[in-house]
Amino acid sequence: MSEAVADGRRVIRVRALAWNEPLVVCPSMVVDCSGEATVAALAGADIENGAADQAAALIFTLEKVDPNLASVGLIGVRCALRKAVEMGRLPALCERLALVPGPSADGQLTLKLNLLPPSDPSCPIWRQITDWEREARALIPELLRFLVESVASFGKARLGSVAPQLGIRSGHRIRGRARLEDEDVLGARKSAVGIARGCWPMERWGRNPRPEMTCLNERDYFEIPLDCLRSADLDNVLAAGRCFSAAAGAMSSARVIGTALATGWAAGTTAALQIQGRTVEEAVALTRRQMEE
């Protein structure tokens, strides 16, 4: 997307490239699922920069890992990484490697190399992502070599795939008509206009090798009010996924895929109903019925 033009409180034109062909849309409603509040930002709306809230990660897979690794213990792998870092055999960043529980029966294992949050919040995000990409991709061969040589379960391992781009956990968010606060999540607060639910812990990936997890009460959940998805500055723009209006801690819970998909469904439903001339209240009622089913 290259342009979003607003006239007063409405976005009237969006310009993008689709397979290198220019595409211009004059929308009645816009649902921004970009993860970066791109439409709102380009249209001049107020946004919040959450790029420094969380560390990014690069996901890759290994093949021919011993399928018994899970029973032998993933903790042993972490201990080996820590010892190698302490002895200077690996860069300190390698201790931030996370293993997704597994491997599968055919020996495929998914790993996440968690990077450090930006040290300079004023650094342009494109420059930061470039630096992260270079750093992470240079470390993967070194990590693989260490695992093959030093951890028995990886003796025959080989690189399977590397994600085409970094996983960015936090980016720009809209300024909404309401804001999901940390206290709303931790207090499992419900809302009469709630359109999505979440129950994942606050999961903060900062400078420590492991995430800081803050859990809700067991079997409880919080609700996200529709106004968190509605731009305060633009009447025909809704945001879903990790770019709706929320505090940093609240978004560290609400950004997970299940909740993100629920906000997308709610935003799309609201947009469709408003195009039909129906009210926001009707959209809330329909979405809440869906949540109860």
Spans of features found by a protein language model:
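Short, hydrophobic/aromatic-rich segments at coil-to-beta transitions
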Residues: 8-14
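Flavin (FAD/FMN)-binding glycine-rich loop and adjacent Rossmann-like elements that form
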Residues: 1-4, 18-29, 33-292
